[in-house]
Amino acid sequence: MNRWTNSMKRCIYFASVYVFLFVTAARCLAQSTMEPWLTRSTDNSRSGWNQHETQLSQASVRSRGIARTTIIPLVGDARGMEAQPLILPNVQTPRGLRDVMVLPSMANVVRGVDAHDGSAIWQAALGTPIDSSATIDSKNINQHWGCISTGVIDPDTRRLYQVCWVSTDNSGKPDPKTAHYFMNVLDVADGHAVVAPVLIQGTSDGQDFNAQMRKQRSSLVETTADGVKTIFGCAGTIFETGSGAAGFCFAFDVASNKQSAILALTAGEGAGVWMAGQGLVADPQGSLYLVTGNGDFDGKTQWGESFLKLKYTPASGGSAATLKVVDHWTPWTDLVRTGQQRASAMKVAGASAPSEAIRTPVNGGMNVSLKNARLESTVSDRGQPVLLVFPDMASGNWSDEDWGSAGPACIFAIGVCVAAGKDGIGYPIKMADLGGTTVADLANPPANCKKLAAPPVWLTMSPGPVDPCPADPRTLNFFPNGDTAHLHMTPVQFHDPLLKSWTIFVWGENAQLHKWAVDQNGRLTYLAQSHEYASADVRGESPGGMPGGFCSGSSNGDDPNSAILACTIPYGDANSSVVNGRLLVYDPVHLAADGSLNVLWDSQRFAVQFLFNKFDPPVIDGGRIYVPNYNGGVDLYELTP
């Protein structure tokens, strides 16, 4: 009996060892399928496309479907996170070799979790966040304001760089004297601080970064400039007008762990950088690209409503590092959009400073009434009737047409960036020569548009025969069918192997998902759209809902059958309140019989409930789709067995 028992024990022992080794091997095999997701939208071009996805495909999603297998919790904030999750595979942690997902919450608590199942690895608290109030967010969507932007991971050093807004006196009050932004440098393996938090600070063009409350929503980017590894970030302000209300960009030197340069983007007011959370684009040569929002423009030191190219020069010898605007292109100014001054009469100094200052936080939105509105009937390019609504409202509202409401799609292979904002107009811009718009150029907008790589187009919707680059920019002051057409998602880039052409996907407010071809010269050609609408529950209730959809894509190289596109949209107006969301997975290559984009999976069909995160696109990696929600966590979707 004892011999039989000992024999059984040995069998059980060896079986346990076998199971352990099998599970460990399976985990390592699974880990090898994960791709690094080191920055928002996967790469420095902000393509939003993972080209190395081997498990999710049109066939696997269509035949097996996906299911939400867990919700990974964030810590300390009811809404969870505004940053996009980041992933660094194959990290040796105190809990073994793991694919680490980094999740910074708005409560300034960063979690490192296993990307496969969300299990905890480490947690780091980075200081007291700022409590939400109408001073910061007129809608009070968020509970706290802490780690707002997406950080960046350096794969060589396994370090996370994350900027967070901290109440240095622990009061949580939005006071510029005590509420400051700090760069945190954490080891991705265990979350420990590599150095003490570094204060973001400095003056530029007479503007003091810490004299006003900034909103550092724009994500970070790491690149090599003149051989020097550097992190860059940008910010806007809580209030866009008034003394000191300027956008800023800053540089952080990786080797020294010190801030090395700072640049105010206007000597006047505005020119904030937010791009709905997107970060700067960094090309292989180290040049940086961004789009600013509302504010002054003079083409010299005031860069509101502009597409900018920045050049960073590292410190050398006795010379300090510098960050400068080296080129730009500007479509119009706030002052002209409000009709307060003709372009031909603009003064160079403070050229577009709006006389009707917008004193509400930057997410205030538009209050549109159809009373006394002027109506024009047109027919869209797709043959559908469109009613153009020109609201009878204070002209100052039209100084809130943020061109920088979305990040640009910069397709390095053809040297073109497509930038679009709240008008929903896509402007193809030559990266090698942006155009250098002057105040005089703005007196003749059609001539200014000739500097573009190709003519602009209505990207998020079609209002019919309306010139997207008119002689009088005030003719753009309308809402199609009474709803806004803003773009907030950065267009997703995909080289379609069947078309043998670059394509982009955009999802504007109160509209459908659109697919466009981009040729070698930057010319945009409409291809298809979905049947599904963003903010479907409030379309037609002027001004409709915000912010449109957010998407990410994946494929296994150039295999056209492997490509999928995952998008989230709100049912209601996610700017004014917390609303339910919808997750859709599309076939981005093969169109349906009616020419529309094919839906492979729809959360609505399976009654999957989640609260929509209004600035965060999904992450597709390793056979999983991660969807940050406003329930305080991240939904993890996987293929069903």
Labelled PLM ranges:
Residues 1-14:
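N-terminal secretory signal peptides that target proteins for export/translocation
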Residues 31-52:
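An edge-strand/N-cap motif at the start of beta-rich repeat modules
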Residues 33, 52-79, 92-97, 108-142, ...:
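Extracytoplasmic/lumenal domain signature
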Residues 15-27:
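Bacterial N-terminal signal peptides
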Residues 82, 86, 110-111, 147:
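Conserved, well-structured interaction surfaces
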Residues 101-106:
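Short secondary-structure subsegments characteristic of cysteine-rich extracellular domains
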